[in-house]
Swiss-Prot record:
Binding site residues for (2R)-3-phosphoglycerate: 99-100, 102, 116, 138-139, 141-142, 197, 229-230
Sites where the protein binds ADP: 275, 299, 402
Amino-acid positions noted as binding Mg(2+) in the UniProt annotation, renumbered to this chain: 434
Residues noted as binding AMP in the record, renumbered to the chain: 277, 281, 300, 372, 403
Gene name of the encoded protein: PGK1
Pathway(s) the chain acts in: Carbohydrate biosynthesis; Calvin cycle
Transit peptide: 1-75
An example Gene Ontology biological process: galactolipid biosynthetic process
GO cellular component: apoplast; chloroplast; chloroplast envelope; chloroplast stroma; cytoplasm; cytosol; membrane; mitochondrion
Cofactor (UniProt): Mg(2+)
Protein name, as recorded: Phosphoglycerate kinase 1, chloroplastic
Top EC group: transferase
Predominant location: plastid
Organism: Arabidopsis thaliana
Length: 481
């Protein structure tokens, strides 16, 4: 393909001066109405609007102020939080806590990654320190009925170690034995119920099953963000029988960042979206185009955009039925003054394998028989320069096939750049899925502002969808600040 055609194809991807002054460019160039200072939160399950007075990006300090009985400073979300409950509310009360402890186990039933267990600890500790009797519920895997390999027994030692107390485990999640264990649970004690998905009624959100779960407790805390997008008995059904029903610290933090920081970001605000298919990220891209100043695209989806602009893509992954959509998204970005950057060079391979022959070519130079598997060094440089201008960044999806070392450079470069920006005070949000695996692989997870624990839940929240597990919780009482 002629270079002139390539130049023409990429000319609409970079707004003049947009990277250096993207917020200003966006305001001038937008042909469509931009939302004013407040954005409706009702589609997300909240009762009010999202503005800078109502959303906090400093969850840690907020939790400390709750513990110190000081002002929360802001109302971070319109759902009641466990931090709103005092010792007087909790002492001696039986609290049903739905956590997401769906951790990976090896063939020896040993936990290989305890991230989700550690993420649930702050809420559980807060409850036991305030004299509550904690009834802990979670699922593990996708069992078909009672399945021994999906028992929660392997979780007990690690839970006990992290909490500093001996956690008791029930052999069921409802029934007389469980009721007896609950009755003997001391203040500050923790009872782990058996896998709630051993009952098919859980995923069917069966009202009678939900009622049996709820009958064990006095109030409800949902800290399972990873399942908040599912209307299951333990995430949505129980709220009809337990009041108050509130968010745990982890769920609250997810909402603070994935709703608060994204809806009212410090600008310039950049979104990085990767992954293999446009179809799986349509909702995210469309939603972020309404909010961001800079949009960086990577991963296998870029080849659908390339082909939509008339470029040859060789044997790269392309969704033929999404070519028109790709063109529409590019036009929408231009109309809104969003600086949308596609990679200008890519790493191509002659087969999809770790030992493939590979080379770096311009985006306009992908030959027949070659497939793109990562972004190239020039693109990394351009993306990094764009990110250097930002104050808020959210990342969802890898830049290439990072599981293969030959094609991991782009993803690892983004992870390292976000770590660098985090240390400079930029708000960095890792929006779930493979991006989380990437920052953990590079060893920079600890410096990010927020790493989402949700996969599908993160995507649906970013798309602006209603999360049943969130909308079912009690509304917060507004705080004057």
């Amino acid at each position: 393909m002629a270079s002139a055609a390539a130049s023409s194809a990429f000319s609409l991807l970079k707004s003049t001066g947009a990277v250096a002054s993207s917020a200003g460019t966006r305001a001038r160039a937008s042909l469509l109405p931009i939302p004013s200072t407040s954005v409706s939160a009702r589609p997300l399950g909240f009762s009010a609007t999202l503005d800078s007075r109502r959303f906090s990006l400093h969850v840690a300090s907020k939790v400390e102020s709750v513990r110190g009985k000081g002002s929360r400073g802001v109302v971070s979300m319109a759902k009641k939080s466990v931090g709103d409950l005092t010792s007087a509310d909790l002492k001696g009360k039986k609290v049903f806590v739905r956590a997401d402890l769906n951790v990976p186990l090896d063939d020896n039933q040993t936990i290989t990654d305890d991230t989700r267990i550690r993420a649930a600890i702050p809420t559980i500790k807060y409850l036991i320190e305030n004299g509550a009797k904690v009834i802990l519920s979670t699922h593990l895997g996708r069992p078909k009925g009672v399945t021994p390999k999906f028992s929660l027994a392997p979780l007990v030692p690690r839970l006990s170690e992290l909490l500093g107390i001996e956690v008791t485990k029930a052999d069921d999640c409802i029934g007389p034995e469980v009721e007896s264990l609950v009755a003997s649970l001391p203040e500050g004690g923790v009872l782990l119920l058996e896998n709630v998905r051993f009952y098919k009624e859980e995923e069917k959100n069966d009202p009678e099953f939900a009622k049996k779960l709820a009958s064990l407790a006095d109030l409800y805390v949902n800290d399972a963000f990873g399942t908040a997008h599912r209307a299951h008995a333990s995430t949505e059904g129980v709220t009809k029988f337990l009041k108050p029903s509130v968010a745990g610290f982890l769920l609250q933090k997810e909402l603070d960042y994935l709703v608060g920081a994204v809806s009212n970001p410090k600008r310039p605000f950049a979104a990085i979206v990767g992954g293999s298919k446009v179809s799986s990220k349509i909702g995210v891209i469309e939603s972020l185009l309404e909010k961001c100043d800079i949009l960086l695209l990577g991963g296998g989806m870029i080849f659908t955009f390339y082909k939509a602009q008339g470029l040859s893509v060789g044997s790269s992954l392309v969704e033929e039925d999404k070519l028109e959509l790709a063109t529409e998204l590019l036009a929408k970005a231009k109309a809104k003054g969003v600086s949308l950057l596609l990679p200008t060079d890519v790493v191509v391979a002659d087969k999809f394998a770790p030992d493939a022959n590979s080379k770096i070519v311009p985006a306009s130079g992908i030959e027949d028989g070659w497939m793109g598997l990562d972004i190239g060094p020039d693109s990394i440089k351009t993306f990094n320069e764009a990110l250097d201008t930002t104050q808020t960044v959210i990342w969802n999806g890898p830049m290439g096939v990072f599981e293969m070392e030959k094609f991991a450079a782009g993803t690892e470069a983004i992870a390292n750049k976000l770590a660098e920006l985090s240390e400079k005070g930029v708000t960095t949000i890792i929006g779930g899925g493979d991006s989380v695996a990437a920052v953990e692989k590079v060893g920079v997870a600890g410096v990010m502002s927020h790493i989402s624990t949700g996969g599908g839940a993160s995507l649906e929240l970013l798309e602006g969808k209603v999360l049943p597990g969130v909308i079912a919780l009690d509304e917060a009482i507004p705080v004057t600040v």
